[in-house]
């Protein structure tokens, strides 16, 4: 067992590191001993690189771990023997703590065998390896690692009391001038071995850290090299693409040049063909001129005859087309010219527009466009109220006259295409009425009239048809002069349109009743009230809902289509003659 411990490099390193820690922490160390250890540390740094030392330490550590696993069983017994011997040694050293002694004398006594201590106290130390073996192992470890491991608190504070380590150097080299007391020796335990194995990972960890840093630097260098290669590869590909693009551009330039040459060649060929054709034509003309005889005359006469036949056929077709166009134009002309009733309607609608745009100007409604509209329609209808009332009076007279139906068949001037009797005047009036309705000028005028009324209760008796002759009193408002005039204007309007509806057979069931109603309203009372205004508004709404104006327009259009055209009558007269 002792032979295995003496041959183990781990045990020698343990003693060398323990001596270094004792040297760093004990105040009794002599300068000579420090000089000796300094010489050993300087010898360990002889031209060895850090990588070689780290590799050697790693190999020795692997050997130590292998031997440790092999000697676990034997070391337990040795530790028990060491504990027993150290107990005896501590008992024998206690009297010598206060006695002056020197390390040199102790070393000499131990070397000569005349030590007063029992032999069993230093028996394990005599089996330790030689100082040269410890020195050789210390040379393999860098001085910076030894100093760092020796200076750590974890190494120096493994036990509460420092354990004396015998000097590994020969006694003749140790010289101590001042005597120092030997510190008490506590029984060492297995912590001494643990302290060694705790120190080994610190060296190994630094070596591993250096290895990691070196491997990281190598990895980073490899990555940079790969990136550099990738960039070079991309650059090479870009250069290849550029070369290919230049080659393509040159090819395209060549193709364009060849196409230009081909186009120029084709143009030259076409010009040559044209020149050849012209020469042929000239030759044919010369040949025709040279020919003489009757054949040419016969051919020319036949061609002329065929041409004349073709011209006659085309002339007949053109004549038919002209007749159809004339017929369509006559029909269009008849439809574009307004009848007398339609002309009266156009005039009355102009009066309506002139009146309400004048009221809009008077009351400040649509002030931006009202003056221009009032000026335009006033030129076409200077007296709107008088014209509407006169038209209503004529309608009243015609409704009483049974022969008034012949009025719609009055003569029509077909030459009046550019005057007031064409359909454009009707279209302009309809557009003006739609503009008036969209701007709600009529509603604004009615609202202003309602705001200007004076409240006056008028006892107005209204007979109730459902009350069997009973009468009831309803409050009514007296209207102003402007509003009374407006009500009279609307009553005349309703009278005129219902009179025309009666004449043309539009809404036969109610037309007669409405005509008599508005005739009685317009001539039956001397004073107009708010009830009359409401009745007039209801009458206008009824007129719009039933579409009386649209029905009258369609009836007049049907009458125009039924009238015979002047050209047809002329054809009949020619046929009779």
Curated annotation (Swiss-Prot):
UniProt lists compositionally biased (Low complexity) regions at 101-116
Going by the UniProt record, its keywords in alphabetical order are: Cell cycle, Cell division, Cell membrane, Coiled coil, Cytoplasmic vesicle, Growth regulation, Membrane, Phosphoprotein
Cellular component GO terms, alphabetical: clathrin-coated vesicle; plasma membrane
What segments bear the compositional bias annotation Acidic residues? 73-83
Basic and acidic residues: bias regions: 205-214
What start-end ranges are recorded for coiled-coil regions in this protein? 206-337
GO-annotated biological processes: cytokinesis by cell plate formation; multidimensional cell growth
Q: Where in the cell is it found?
A: Cell membrane; Cytoplasmic vesicle, Clathrin-coated vesicle
Bias class Polar residues marks the residues at: 15-28
Q: Which residues carry this modification: Phosphoserine?
A: 130
| Mode of membrane association | Peripheral membrane protein
Q: What is the reported tissue distribution?
A: Expressed in the mature region of the primary root, tips of short, young lateral roots, guard cells in the epidermis of cotyledons and rosette leaves, the socket cells surrounding the base of trichomes and hydathodes of fully expanded rosette leaves.
UniProt note: phenotype after gene disruption = Defects in seedling development, root elongation, leaf expansion, flower morphogenesis and fertility due to defective cytokinesis in epidermal cells.
Chain intervals for the UniProt region annotation (Disordered): 1-42, 67-214
What the protein does comes down to: Involved in growth and development through its role in cytokinesis and polarized cell expansion. Required for plasma membrane internalization. May function in clathrin-mediated membrane trafficking, including plasma membrane endocytosis, essential to both cytokinesis and cell expansion.
Q: What is this protein called?
A: Coiled-coil domain-containing protein SCD2
Natural source organism: Arabidopsis thaliana
Gene encoding this chain? SCD2
